[in-house]
Design a protein with these regions (language model features):
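Short, surface-exposed ligand-recognition loops at beta-strand->loop->(often short) alpha-helix junctions
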Residues: 24-34
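Glycine-centered tight turns that cap/initiate beta-strands
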Residues: 86, 165, 313-316
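Structural recognition of the beta-strand scaffold that forms the well-ordered cores
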Residues: 24, 91, 152-155, 234-239, ...
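Active-site core segment of subtilase-fold serine proteases
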Residues: 113-234, 247, 251-262, 266, ...
Length: 581
């Protein structure tokens, strides 16, 4: 590992670019690890490791021992792998800049801030808004059984610190560091060469919002204390990144599987990217089948809900402020499930100054902060009803869907709430715990197998992933979903992609099967490219709204996309290049 390179990339966000980590390979038949090894060796040589993942015996993770491939080479090799007999799909894996660091012509706020402008000095305002204390008093009256007792939350993040607000509830010996591959997930607050990181101790403030005991555990410089939603819950720290700038999708996937195998009941993921990734989806499915409730951040200052929050199996959380208004940086869209406090929420923070560690409680902002609070509510629900009893009654894999349904049914709409934008509304912990459990035969629970089909992969040839990425630009924002409008909006997107990929609309599904994954990758990791296509789509949408008398065929004719194609031609694989020229 080149620690100096890592340090430079982390310290200077402008230097960040996707970094190759390996491949995801899906085979047609189960139990073919030896065949995968043969394919990889024949194609690339001996320095590759093959590991079977998931429950189907058809999915494999392939990693390289030494050299690192360029993005272009990785995609070229993925097409080589796909062409081999028996291979259903091959997808390159990358560590990617986190979506809330990307420039989409928006101005992100600093995550942790001391500004007193519009600052709510009541450190428990977020808990009061979610009616957490009412839930405690009604459903956890025994002082010897604190709210959330018996529940374990897995936290893939930057690791733990010994902050007094969290340390008593951290299961240190159960943790794992996926950066160093050892059992100590401690957040070192700096990159390997000693460079201090922007937004340090991210894992500390997400931990504190879940399980900090009530009130200050010591005197802090701010003079404040704080309280977590489920102070009886324990946390497994899983260190997957140095800072919330560069996300290893491979590390996150491994951490999710590790949590499922090591006793976690809930997962809180305050990380995400714009990449639909089969390796990550495999891990999500693996955990969901074992009954883990997975909660993830919708994203900050991006025009779509990031993954893994966008997966159907995951509860996607966007954020609001103390006035019950949506926070301006919150991602929004149809994939959002619920809203929770995220703007100037008080949480624990650990800093390193001149080699000395300093602990404090400060306000922070971002969907990273609403996510662990909803995970805390999940812990309260499991603790109150008894997870073992829920498994006995429903089976493990239905628990996440039952909770998601009850959570959404218990939400409260707020003044600026819009359907298909902010989920069901602001979460209400008291209502969640008061809600009756469904009958075994209820049809309101989404069957796990059905949920897996609701967001098909790009290689199916469908538009879903692109419709998701450009939901804000393409789809009509009216409050009621109009079927004919959706058809027309899909037609516009289809026409634009067909022109971009130099094909007809009828042949577009086949073209997307061939190169759609690579196109989506560049759109998610290149802000300039995304912006160019978004503007073309938005312009087309505006034109069609002004000229209602045009026919559907005329209104769906896209703007010129030559500039988008020119950007793509600079970097793409040889296979993709032939489809663009």
């Amino acid at each position: 590992v080149n620690f100096m390179d890592i340090s430079d990339r982390l310290h200077n966000p402008n230097n960040l670019s996707p970094k190759f980590e390996g491949f995801f390979i899906e085979m047609a038949m189960p139990g073919q690890k030896q065949r995968v090894q043969e394919i990889v060796t024949e194609a690339f040589g001996l320095d590759w490791n093959v590991k079977q993942i998931g429950d189907n015996s058809t999915e494999f993770e392939v990693t390289l021992n030494k050299e690192v491939l360029s993005v272009k080479d990785a995609w070229d090799k993925s097409y080589n792998l796909r062409s081999q007999p028996g291979v259903v799909d091959a997808q390159p894996l990358f560590a990617v800049p986190l979506s809330d660091r990307q420039d989409f012509n928006l101005e992100p706020e600093v995550v942790m801030e001391r500004s007193i402008d519009n600052l709510n000095t009541d450190v428990e305002w977020s808990l009061k808004q979610m009616r957490v204390f009412e839930a405690w008093s009604r459903f956890f009256p025994d002082p010897n059984r604190p709210p959330g007792h018996g529940i374990i939350i897995g936290l893939p993040d930057t690791g733990y610190t010994e902050h007094p607000e969290i340390i008593t509830n951290i299961l240190i010996k159960k943790g794992y560091d996926f950066l160093k591959n050892d059992q100590d997930a401690k957040d070192e607050l700096e990159a390997p060469s000693g460079v201090l990181l922007p937004a340090p101790s991210h894992g500390t403030y997400t931990s504190s919002l879940m399980s900090s005991p009530r009130g200050a555990q010591r005197n802090y410089p701010s003079g404040k204390g704080m309280t977590g939603v489920a102070p009886g819950a324990k946390i497994i720290p899983l260190r997957v990144c140095y800072s919330v700038i560069l996300l290893s999708v491979l590390n996150l996937a491994k951490a999710i599987e590790y949590a499922a195998d090591n006793g976690a009941h809930v997962l809180s993921i305050s990380l995400g990217s714009g990449l639909f990734n089969k390796r990550l989806r495999s891990a999500i499915t693996y955990a969901q089948k074992r009954g883990l409730i997975i909660v993830a951040a919708a994203g900050n200052f991006v025009p779509y809900v990031v993954w893994p929050a966008a997966y159907e199996e995951v509860i996607a959380v966007t954020g609001c402020d103390a006035q019950r208004e949506i926070w301006k940086g919150s991602a929004r869209g149809q994939q959002v499930d619920v809203t929770a406090p995220c703007d100037k929420v008080w949480c624990a923070k650990t800093k390193k100054k001149n080699g000395e560690i300093e602990y404090d409680v400060e306000p922070g902002t971002g969907t990273s902060l609403c996510t662990p609070q909803v995970a805390g509510i999940a812990a309260l629900w499991l603790s109150y009803h008894g997870r073992d009893q829920l498994i006995q009654r429903y089976g493990a894999e239905k628990i996440p869907f039952i909770f998601n349904q009850i959570l959404r049914d218990s939400c409260e709409e707020f003044p600026t709430w819009k359907p298909n934008k902010f989920g069901a509304g602001i979460v209400n912990a008291e209502k969640v715990l008061a809600a009756p459990l469904p009958d075994n035969a209820t049809r309101s629970i989404i069957a796990p197998a059905q949920a897996l089909e609701q967001h098909p992969a790009i290689d199916s040839g469908k538009l879903d992933t692109f419709a998701h990425l450009f939901e804000e630009q393409v789809f009509d924002s009216q409050e009621e979903t109009n079927f004919m409008q959706v058809v027309e909006d899909n037609k516009k997107l289809q026409a634009s992609l067909a022109e971009l990929l130099q094909t007809t609309e009828s042949e577009l599904p086949q073209r997307l099967k061939e190169v759609g994954q690579e196109l989506a990758f560049y759109l998610a990791t290149n802000p300039e490219l995304y912006q160019q296509l978004a503007e073309a789509l938005k312009s087309e949408n505006s034109d069609s709204n002004q000229l209602k008398t045009r026919t559907l065929t005329e209104s769906s004719k896209p703007n010129n996309l030559d500039s988008v194609r020119e950007i793509l031609l600079q970097n793409v694989s040889e296979v993709f290049k032939t489809k663009l020229e």
